[in-house]
Design a protein with these regions (language model features):
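ABC ATP-binding cassette signature C-motif
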Residues: 1-192
Length: 192
């Protein structure tokens, strides 16, 4: 996984990603910013949509003072942004955050709890939730079932089985692997 994510260089060959591929990696060592709530971290998965909404609001403000020619262009720009927001389920952000929070047991902790007060396992759940909400083209998961109880593992199985993009995962949980993957590559370190 370290070679795939670029943290280590391979002894031979290279790893290349297509230009427009977004890969998301669950790094269990990522620091979470003190003062942010679980809800804020999960919602940050949609920052690009929130930025788009700000851009749309800026266009609406300009419309109040625009002449006829400018108004036409502003309306087209606003329409394009509105279509993008709708296509990316912008108006469902809160319900998606709630769903993932509930599914990973974060709602039981309280979505408004400061992430600096969480245990290591709880922080990992927050990072997993954010990553799942980001829906990258390729999801890279390193031991995703660590810190998850049976019901949360079952939810993750369903999520991955329905995931429309590719994912690569490392796990020692054989029943979990057998239920979510269609290709297994077993790497064994052999010392010479």
């Amino acid at each position: 996984m370290n070679i795939i994510t670029g943290r280590l260089q391979p002894d031979e060959g290279k790893v290349e990603w297509s230009k427009n591929v977004r890969a998301g990696y669950l790094d269990q060592h990522t620091a979470l910013e003190k003062g942010m709530t679980i809800r804020q971290v999960l919602t940050s998965a949609f920052d690009f949509l929130l930025d788009m909404e700000q851009e749309l609001n800026g266009i609406y403000e300009k419309m109040g003072e625009a002449d006829e020619d400018t108004m036409q262009q502003l309306m087209e720009d606003a329409g394009t942004l509105q279509e993008l927001l709708t296509a990316h389920d912008f108006y469902m952000i809160d319900s998606k955050v709630e769903e993932v929070g509930r599914a990973l047991g974060l709602s039981e902790i309280g979505l408004d709890k400061d992430v600096s007060e969480l245990s290591g396992g709880q922080r990992t759940k927050v990072l997993l939730g954010k990553l799942l909400l980001e829906k990258p083209d390729i999801l890279l998961l390193d031991e995703p079932t660590n810190y998850l109880d049976v019901s949360h593992i079952e939810w993750l199985k369903r999520y991955l089985n329905d995931y429309e993009n590719a994912f690569i995962l490392i796990s020692h949980d054989i029943p979990f692997l057998n239920s979510v993957v269609n290709l297994i590559l077993s790497l064994i370190h052999i010392s010479e």
